[in-house]
Curated annotation (Swiss-Prot):
One of its GO terms (molecular function) is zinc ion transmembrane transporter activity. Keywords: Cell membrane, Disulfide bond, Endosome, Glycoprotein, Ion transport, Membrane, Metal-binding, Signal, Transmembrane, Transmembrane helix, Transport, Ubl conjugation, Zinc, Zinc transport. Residues 236-267 have a biased composition (Basic and acidic residues). It comes from Mus musculus (Mouse). This is Zinc transporter ZIP4. The lineage of its organism: Eukaryota, Metazoa, Chordata, Craniata, Vertebrata. Zn(2+) 2 binds at N521, D524, E550. One of its GO terms (biological process) is cellular response to zinc ion starvation. Coiled coil: none annotated. Belongs to the ZIP transporter (TC 2.A.5) family. The chain crosses the membrane at residues 338-358, 377-397, 421-441, 512-531, 540-566, 572-592, 600-620, 631-651.
Amino acid sequence: MLPKSVTQGLVLALLVGTVAVARPRNLLSLLALGQGALDRLELDGLLNTLVARVHCTDGPCEKCLSVENVLALGKPDKPQPAPESVLESRHIIYLSAAAALYLNNPEKTCKDIQAGLLASHVDDYLATLESPEAMTLGLSQLLQKIEAHAASQPTGEKTCVDLPQLLEEAEAAGVSKSAGLVLTALLDHVINGSCFQGLPSPQYFVDFVFRLHSSDPPNITLHELENLMHHLGVGGEDHSDHDDHGDHADHSHPDRKASHQDSELHTPHNSNSSVWDTLCLSAKDIMAVYGLSEEAGVSPQAWAQLTPALVQQQLSGACSPYPTIRIQDQLSQTERYLYGSLATLLICLCAVFGLLLLTCAKCSTATHYIMQTFLSLAVGALTGDALLHLIPKVLGLHTHGGEGHTHEEEVGVGGQATWRLLAVLGGFYIFFLFESFFNLLLPRDQDSEKDGPCSHGGHSHGISLQLAPSNLRQSKQTHESSRSDLVAEETPELLNPETRRLRAELRLLPYLITLGDAVHNFADGLAVGAAFSSSWKTGLATSLAVFCHELPHELGDFAALLHAGLSVKRALLLNLASALTAFAGLYVALAVGVGEEGEAWILAVATGLFLYVALCDMLPAMMNVRDQRPWLLFLLHNVGLLGGWTVLLLLSLYEDNITF
């Protein structure tokens, strides 16, 4: 029989031991099995350990991520979980993502928790890591942040955990590799106190070169070295063996081999270290890989060490000037549909804007000048978006480096391209001024004087955009009056024999306008969908350009339908029906889920569409109009053009500084 004091001591020790072993189990295994759960005690122990692993700038970080916050992530329909609630295994991914956000930026995550934004930011973070390229870049940056925020680094561990190891563990779990699984494996190592390495090891760069260009390890043959040098654009042709013309099989064909090797650069490899192949490293990153001090610089001996890294970056094409979108600029699938639908809805409301023509029937002259201002604004917005925003993006001149990468060079290249393309608009504007001044200063034809306050010089292109103010007036006939009477009263010139032959065309005009507008709006929807799939900034710029050209276009279509003899109700319905096809184009672009390459092609086609509509449809409608106040019209045209270009120029130059 043990003494009472000894018995109490054993019981106390047993309780302490129970608390000590109440640490979380292997989360990745729990997630892979799909069974089991974490109770509140395990969660609390996990969060305490997580906080202990992080060091903030002003000392230890506060424990702002509570058990209730985590349980709310797992059960969004129950924001106030019961005390006996547990975190099911299928919700461990959300816990891992929340922990990753905390490890990346503890102070910001605590503010998000206080504002109630943690759940939405967790969903957004998982969405940004969907593609393999984004996952590699995002997790590499996360590992570097964990290194910076680590409270202490284990000294007894020879190698630290890197991204390839995390991917291996997620793949070995027996489930498909995804960002959530990799984050769960990462959280396991954080809890176990492992150190992390966010950049590849120096040996990786040598392995990469030999993996691509050595068919007989461990050495690179002369033939393979020739192909490697050809791919790097260095070296000359060796003429020493050209005397032997009989053995042509020994001659190298660098073009053919280089093309073959180039195709291999973009294919997956068996080596687990290939996860780094698409990572573009800055000079600071490369110096960090080799442990070089920024103050001391690179010595001749160190230069020989880091040369393989420079060769690897050239061979992999990781830093090639293709458009890449910063992770924080990308939208989740839900946000793409939401913002795209809102933008398309605003564009479709342009069709209803035609009702303003009825309210301004007695002030048709003012309506005419408003239409001309919107026409010039549309030309400025379309050409500005095409030249200053879409073309640099399609050609890869407007790139955004990831966090931690040097941005000065990219800003220089993108900014220089923007100013040069602005010079293209400058040449366009100079010749616009020349033609406008010629039209203003040269004597006008007598026929144009007889045409009234504003006519259009006989130019037939874009009939819906070249209507005189008289065509915008409401009919003073009753609803019982025939449409032919309406047309005859508003346009008595139709009574002559020549225009009678045009009556059949006028009857077909509503259907032609509706069909053409429907196809046009479908293409606009495709452009908006591809733009929002790329980034919210590209979506904003494209939506602005589409809105600016749809507003005068829809107003002109509405007036043309009234001019053809349709009732107000029917004209409005046809205009709305054609406008709604933009939603079809939007959802097709979003549902297909095109990648960066597909987005570039769609935006390239949209660029051509914008330039065609601006230069072949709307610009002639501006230039061929005749008015009794030509200088006022000239002023309004300049205001619209310069206003559209200014907005798109500012958006192109300063879009990186726009944050929400």
